[in-house]
Amino acid sequence: MPLALAATAGLAGCTYGTGESAYRTAVQQTWRVGPLQGFQGAALGSELVRYATLAPSSHNTQCWKFALDNETITIFPDLTRRCPAVDPDDHHIFVSLGCATENLIQAARAHGLRGKAEFDEARSAVRITLSPVAAEATDLFNAIVSRQSTRAEYDGKPIASDDLKRLEAAAKSDRVRSLLLTDRPALESVLDFVVQGNTAQMNDKAFVDELKAWIRFNGADAVRLGDGLFSKSSGNPEVPAWLGGLMFGFFFTPKAENEKYVKHLRSSAGVAVFAGAKEDKAHWVEVGRSYERFALQATVLGIRTAHVNMPVEVASLRPKFAEAIGLGRTRPDLVIRFGRGPTLPPSLRRPVRAVLV
């Protein structure tokens, strides 16, 4: 560890004991397994929303709002949390709504409700109609509280073919194509696009400033805000916010980040690419649902996942990447690496009351 990082790690340990304790308490509260009985009415709706908010979102912005209305729950995009530098067309926002939709439907089934999701074009929202059904707590539902985006090196070992088939089956959708790339030449090609995309983003001041604004450099800030990217969730030390801002400028460089992603990709068992059949909001939601099932099934199997979306976020690279992986003119929506590896401290969520309208 560089001396500067070692020193700041020590400082964090001395300064943020209280913040770390609050963070541990917040983790237990956020990622808890709730009871499957005893909820009804608004309380049941709020519990389903809680599970929905455990879905991933770009920079952990939690870019959603939920409206409860008798037998329906509607998920709206929260455009006050948009990230115009990395996501100028709000693509990631609607993918995130899809992830939340899938979690909610899985949770509804566990609580004795069938959820049917439809995209409301007029309101750019997802409307989920709920009706009674025999309760079933599926493996995917049980995995919701354990799923995380694990931004770490994996063990480099291949995934068994039976497990790959389970991942493919979980992601299956009539409106989304999913590609699982596991051979080394294909992964090296993906890595090349990741490095190109990362270099472009790292040289984009607007992107860097936007990312920095969503980083929570210590547990106290992570708990206070309940959103964003907690530094320890990426394997980085916990430091005061003012010091984290200074360190960010020194250590967050194209060279360092590219070296990290080379290690991350080369230690991964494979890469999954998700592409909607059409390039519109409704299909982006479906991409999110497909990916979330994939991520939950991976969690069931003890497989970690993490986003490496640079090839689809940099517009000039996207069509070249699509051609390279055999998608032709279809827009690729998500690039996900997967493999077995460690868990990291989880990100937090805002309370349910903060996302209800």
Predicted regions and their residues:
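Acidic, surface-exposed loops and disordered segments
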Residues: P2-V357
